[in-house]
Design a protein with these regions (language model features):
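Short hydrophobic/aromatic patches on the structural cores and recognition surfaces of FHA
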Residues: 74, 90, 105
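Conserved short histidine dyad/triad with adjacent acidic residue
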Residues: 28-33, 46-62, 100
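Short beta-strand segments
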Residues: 57, 85, 126-128
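Ligand-binding loop in jelly-roll beta-barrel domains
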Residues: 97-125
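A generic structural signal for short beta-strands and their flanking turns/coil linkers
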Residues: 30, 41-46, 65-67, 74, ...
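Short acidic-glycine-tyrosine-enriched beta hairpin
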Residues: 82-98
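Short, conserved beta-strand element in jelly-roll/cupin
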Residues: 47-51, 61-79, 118-121
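A short, N-terminal "cap"/entry segment at the start of jelly-roll beta-barrel domains
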Residues: 1-42, 128-169
């Protein structure tokens, strides 16, 4: 039998990485970068585990990168422009580029959730906007901040998992 090609990867062999934004101590749900491990350069494919009380990222919108989130296991709440929408295994949320729709995914349940997250990989033309975290702008090169994001009204939800309310940023 020939050796297994490098473009076939096992999720268990790809290490998890838990991102922490500058100016914060909150670890986002850990991610396995499957697409990068398999050699993909234009499409990002990530397996993200959201333990109870975590979220996928800070709420954000992107100017020139499409993104999707598919729930493999468990239940999450999609934070969309300040409103929560329940999602369960088998549900998909898709974010076309340039709409200004801000989003993140929150696990307020009592068990892990598993998400398949995919989209474009770091396009040079892409800009990003964090509606609830404007101080993020100082951590990014000016050229990466989305200045002319389409205006969208935000709902009342603060974007935090229930377990994080009242904790240090």
């Amino acid at each position: 039998m020939p050796d297994r090609p490098a473009f076939i990867v096992s999720a268990a062999s790809v290490p998890e990485d838990a991102h922490v934004y500058p100016q914060s101590t909150e670890a986002m749900g850990p991610t396995r970068s499957l697409g990068a491990a398999a050699g993909l350069q234009r499409i990002g494919i990530n397996l993200q585990r959201l333990p109870p009380g975590t979220r996928s990222s800070w709420p954000h919108a992107e100017s020139d990168e499409e993104e999707f989130v598919y729930v493999i296991e468990g239940e999450v709440q999609a934070w969309i422009d300040g409103h929560l929408h329940p999602m369960k295994a088998g549900d998909l949320a898709a974010f076309p580029a340039g709409t200004g729709v801000s989003h993140c995914f929150i696990n307020n349940s009592e068990r892990d959730a598993l998400l398949l997250v995919g989209g474009d990989v770091a396009r040079p033309s892409n800009r990003i906007f964090y509606p609830l975290n404007p101080t993020r702008r100082q951590d990014l090169p000016e050229a990466l901040w989305w200045h002319d994001v389409p205006p969208r009204a935000l709902g009342p939800h603060d974007g935090l998992p229930d377990a994080r309310r009242g904790m240090a940023p």
